[in-house]
Amino acid sequence: MQILLANPRGFCAGVDRAISIVERALELFGTPIYVRHEVVHNRYVVNGLRERGAIFIEQIEDVPDGAILIFSAHGVSQAVRNEAKSRDLTVFDATCPLVTKVHMEVARASKKGIEAILIGHAGHPEVEGTMGQYSNADGGMYLVESPEDVWQLQVKDESNLCFMTQTTLSVDDTYAVIDALRERFPQIVGPRKDDICYATTNRQEAVRHLSDKADVVFVVGSKNSSNSNRLAELAQRAGKAAYLIDSAEDIQESWVEGASHVGVTAGASAPDILVQQVIQRLKALGGKVAVEMQGREENIVFEVPKELRVEVKQVD
């Protein structure tokens, strides 16, 4: 049984930055550090930070005065940001810069009174944060998930519309929704550059290549990770058995029976240690040496806030 590794896979620049912000805050300021929502959607990462003293909360009111608060990589609404500002809190923003780009698009539309349509998944924290950048009562902010939603949508002024997207969507599904938007609202304006982030696009492209070779595909990622779910869906659409797993312990021997090639990838919030554990589990089930597939090289890095870049002095 050959083990094939998708390339690229795992951590993206935004996730790396968000985790580093929490780690640096813990190093510089000690415990506790409060984080609004899971900093990234991965159980292993969140549990590790929790063990080190991070406290994950959903409501700003749960943070005591004078505490340090970090916003998750998914971003927050303007209302949440304003609530934090009104409190005696030190705030560090771990919002992915590519999510912030979409926030700015929405804020500009709100300021100009342009109605805005967001393509995204209802209830996802990134969507809630992005929708929460719009405040102009004379305009309008709408959420659509499918072409069907587009055809049912009613807006105030079809000649004054723009759209943007969640960063972690299926590329193919999103283009289908965009096509519907352009057909329904011919004058609608889209972003100058695609809102779906480079890491989402690259990992989806990599899992397509992986699915061409593999009989079974394992996606390392948590159930609440949007981009990880999209990877599993892509492999399934390619006709392959695909499993979204949190860890190597989830793998059942029956899943790989009769498979000659087993593929492994990881969502953008899944650390490489989990992939290595999956490889070891597959080797125990008869897998050979893992082979890296060719793919796009990624060299994007997002800096942490300057306040967190200072060196921690070691005390003898």
Curated annotation (Swiss-Prot):
(2E)-4-hydroxy-3-methylbut-2-enyl diphosphate binds at H41, H74, H124, T167, S225, S226, N227, S269. The active site is at E126 (proton donor). GO terms for molecular function: 4 iron, 4 sulfur cluster binding; 4-hydroxy-3-methylbut-2-enyl diphosphate reductase activity; metal ion binding. Isopentenyl diphosphate binds at H41, H74, H124, S225, S226, N227, S269. Homodimer. Catalyzes the conversion of 1-hydroxy-2-methyl-2-(E)-butenyl 4-diphosphate (HMBPP) into a mixture of isopentenyl diphosphate (IPP) and dimethylallyl diphosphate (DMAPP). Acts in the terminal step of the DOXP/MEP pathway for isoprenoid precursor biosynthesis. This is 4-hydroxy-3-methylbut-2-enyl diphosphate reductase. The lineage of its organism: Bacteria, Pseudomonadati, Pseudomonadota, Gammaproteobacteria, Enterobacterales.
